[in-house]
Amino acid sequence: MAAAAIGEANLAQFGRAQRVIPGGVNSPVRAFRSVGGTPRFMVFANGPYIVDAEGREYVDLVASWGPAILGHAHPAVVSAVQEAAARGLSFGASTPAETELAEAVIARVPFVEKLRLVSTGTEATMTAIRLARGFTGRPLLIKFAGHYHGHSDSLLAEAGSGLATLSLPGSAGVTEATAAQTLVLPYNDLGAVRAVFEANGPDIAAVIAEAAAANMGVVPPDEGFNAALTDLAHEYGALLILDEVLTGFRVSEAGFWGLDRGYTPDLVAFGKVIGGGMPLAAVGGRAELMDILAPAGPVYQAGTLSGNPVAVAAGLATLAHAGEAVYDRLDIVAGTLSAAVSDALTAEGVAHSVQRAGNLFSFVFGDVAAAPRTFAEVQRQEAFRYRAFFHAMLDAGVSLPPSVFEAWFVTAAHDDAAVGRVLEALPAAARAAASACPGRPLLFVRR
């Protein structure tokens, strides 16, 4: 059933939520601030579809922001969760399934020798950074503008005015002293990285980078960038932390690293797919590093719900069913949809570029660059065209990410019927994008 204008149920739910939840949402991007309008409140999902409080069904291209690679409510995952829940929701003790999941990850990603389970991607990256600082005894961290690694204080930093300038707080509540320990550099710029290492090398503990940027839209690394980044970090005695929270086990059985081999990260953060839609994440790496985590070593990390048995069951079931056929289907659907959107926009004269990293894709609207490589280039786009495109698709029954800075996510459950519904909606949405006019300034909202 195609969507129509926003209904009373969604409006009522949003109003009710705003009275008791800050902004009416529990993660900012859900509020539709980047695209305008009233957010949909979802009540049911199955396969490639999701249903809102009005009972309207949408083809879902958000997929819970990535975890649902098999589709919503996959029978094997649901069954595994039900069986685990029947045995107990949480024990506060170790379980055999934790070891099974660690073994499954290590089998897929050979540079991971040991794995620690946590509950969120933020915890995973935060722990990786603490490990790097504990191992090297150094305070500083390099990250890239536009890369998102969760909401821990040291990662909510923005670039200062100069190349080697210590960074500024990126959120109220983050102290200048904390932000000053993070050096924010332009992505895909090895020269900038080398310059900062030359100036601050003895104090830099690690470089943290998304394996492929997917939180400023999709911006893949330049060919050889991740390998060169690793070599450069090691040259100065620093570590490379690869953030695969979003890409891990989504773009291949070994994450984006599986598509971009030729280097060995020191630490890696996983999330989303590893939990199959449940709150679960992990940090992994070589044993020499992982063994300084408590209780084996002096770097502290703990969590009451770390390795929650229900979440672990969902993750194990998801990984068990995410084989070659699933990734082949994801690639086919991503290729079909990204090409179709591009064709529709081209037909209406809308300048754009298609951005892909494996089966992740997004679009940059406007004549920005043939293939934007940095956050600064991505920010120059005509986001007002995406707002119009987004709402036209939503009205036609297709749920897209409510921000031009987010990747589109497909699932193995997106069959020809679901893909066909998306294709049918594209011409009108492209016309809406073509006729859109600039409005309020571009708003960048992290999820």
Swiss-Prot record:
Cofactor entry: pyridoxal 5'-phosphate
SUPFAM superfamilies in UniProt: PLP-dependent transferases
Alphabetized Gene3D superfamilies for the sequence: Aspartate Aminotransferase, domain 1, Type I PLP-dependent aspartate aminotransferase-like (Major domain)
PROSITE patterns: AA_TRANSFER_CLASS_3
Chief location category: cytoplasm
Pathways involved: Porphyrin-containing compound metabolism; protoporphyrin-IX biosynthesis; 5-aminolevulinate from L-glutamyl-tRNA(Glu): step 2/2
Assembly: Homodimer.
Protein name, per record: Glutamate-1-semialdehyde 2,1-aminomutase
Organism: Leifsonia xyli subsp. xyli (strain CTCB07)
Gene: hemL
